[in-house]
C-alpha cells in the first residue's frame, strides 16, 4: 500500500529549484554521500504495551514516510517494563509486541518489516583481544546481513533487546547495550569479527530517535515546561542536575545519557530526537479525525518528518508559547501532556 506524503516533498522541491553554483556543491556531495549509500535512522520504541493500536498504526505510517524520504529504519524494541510487570518470559513478551509492531509496519511500508531475534551476540570480555577499540561493549552485531539485507530492500528490521552468548543461549540484554552496539556497527566503528559486510560499509547512521511514552525532556525554566533543543556539550550537566533535584522520572536521565553515548560515536551533524508515540503519529491521526462538516483545518506538522528535512526542532526555543497553538504547530495540550519533542545534538557544528 502506498503512502500519501501530501506536501512533504515541497521543501526539497523548492531547494532543488534554487539557483546554485553547482560545480563545488556537487563535488562536496559526492564525497559525503557515496553511490548507493544507505542512510539510516536508529529508532528505539520503549514500552509498546502502553501504546494503543491506533497510535501504533500512526507510528508505522510515519516510519513508512521516512523510508519514502530515503531514510531507512532500524527499530529496537524495548519491552523491559512489560517483562518486569508480567509473569511470562521476556521472549514471549518480545514476540507478542514484535508481532504487533511488524503487522502495523506491514500495513504501510511497501517492503514491510522483519522481526529479527538472532542478529546480536554477547561477547566474552575476558577473551577480547587488546586490539579491539575501547568503544566495544558486551553486545555486538554478530550477523550484519540479517539487518543490511532488509535495509537494502527498504524493509524495516525490528530488533528485540536479546542476544546469543558463546554457547548459543539467548539472553535478555539492556537496551543501552543494544543501541550502542548498533550505533557502532552502522557507523563503521565496530570491530570486524568475520568477513566484512559491504552493505554495512555503505550505511550512514544519521539519526537517533527515541520513541518514549515520557516524550521529550521537561524543564521548569520555560513557560511551556519543555526542552525544545539541547546542546549536550553545554547543557548535559545542568539538565542532569535539574532532573535529579526536581524529582523527575529517572527514565529521562537514562534516555539522555544513552543519547549522549550514541551521539559521541557519530559525526557532529548527527542528531537525536526524543518524542512521544502520540507526537510521532500526529499527522496520521490528524488526517483520520478531520471534520466532515466542511470546515478546513491546517495539517499539523510531524516532528520526525520536519527533523529529517531540516535537522532542526519543529519549533524555535525562542518562540512564545502563545503562538504555538495559533500557528497550528502544536495542538492545544493539557498540562499533563505539555512535554513535547526534544532535539538533541552533541554540540554546535
Language-model region placement:
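Intrinsic disorder at enzyme termini
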Residues: 304-331
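Hydrophobic/aromatic interaction determinants used to assemble and anchor large protein complexes
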Residues: 9, 25, 140, 277, ...
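Conserved, well-ordered active-site substructure
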Residues: 227-230, 288-299
Amino acid at each position: 500500500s502506498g503512502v500519501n506524503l501530501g506536501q512533504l516533498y515541497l521543501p526539497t522541491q523548492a531547494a532543488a529549484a534554487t539557483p546554485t553554483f553547482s560545480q563545488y556543491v556537487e563535488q562536496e556531495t559526492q564525497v559525503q554521500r557515496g553511490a548507493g549509500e544507505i542512510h539510516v535512522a536508529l529508532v528505539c520504541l520503549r514500552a509498546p504495551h502502553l501504546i494503543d493500536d491506533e497510535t501504533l498504526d500512526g507510528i508505522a505510517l510515519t516510519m513508512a514516510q521516512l523510508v519514502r524520504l530515503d531514510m531507512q529504519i532500524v527499530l529496537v524494541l524495548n519491552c523491559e517494563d512489560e517483562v518486569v510487570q508480567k509473569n511470562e518470559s521476556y521472549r514471549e513478551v518480545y514476540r507478542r509486541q514484535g508481532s504487533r509492531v511488524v503487522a502495523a509496519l506491514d500495513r504501510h511500508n511497501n517492503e514491510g518489516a522483519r522481526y529479527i531475534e538472532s542478529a546480536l551476540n554477547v561477547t566474552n570480555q575476558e577473551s577480547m583481544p587488546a586490539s579491539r577499540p575501547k568503544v566495544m561493549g558486551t553486545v555486538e552485531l554478530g550477523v550484519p546481513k540479517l539487518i543490511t539485507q532488509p535495509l537494502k530492500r527498504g524493509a524495516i528490521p525490528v530488533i528485540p533487546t536479546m542476544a546469543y552468548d558463546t554457547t548459543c543461549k539467548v539472553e535478555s540484554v539492556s537496551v543501552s547495550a543494544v543501541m550502542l552496539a548498533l550505533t557502532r556497527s552502522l557507523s563503521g566503528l565496530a570491530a570486524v569479527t568475520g568477513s566484512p559486510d559491504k552493505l554495512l560499509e555503505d550505511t550512514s547512521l544519521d539519526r537517533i530517535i527515541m520513541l518514549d511514552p515520557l516524550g521529550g525532556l521537561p524543564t521548569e525554566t520555560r513557560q511551556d515546561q519543555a526542552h525544545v533543543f539541547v546542546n549536550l556539550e553545554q547543557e548535559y550537566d545542568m539538565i542532569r542536575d535539574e532532573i535529579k533535584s526536581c524529582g523527575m522520572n529517572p527514565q529521562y536521565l537514562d534516555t539522555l545519557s544513552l543519547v549522549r553515548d550514541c551521539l559521541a560515536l557519530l559525526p557532529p551533524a548527527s542528531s537525536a530526537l526524543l518524542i512521544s508515540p502520540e507526537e510521532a503519529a500526529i499527522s496520521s491521526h490528524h488526517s483520520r479525525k478531520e471534520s466532515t462538516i466542511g470546515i478546513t483545518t491546517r495539517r499539523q506538522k510531524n516532528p520526525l518528518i520536519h527533523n529529517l528535512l531540516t535537522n532542526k526542532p519543529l519549533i524555535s526555543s525562542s518562540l512564545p508559547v502563545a503562538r504555538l497553538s495559533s500557528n497550528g504547530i502544536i495542538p492545544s495540550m493539557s498540562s499533563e501532556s505539555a512535554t513535547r519533542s526534544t532535539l538533541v545534538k552533541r554540540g554546535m557544528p
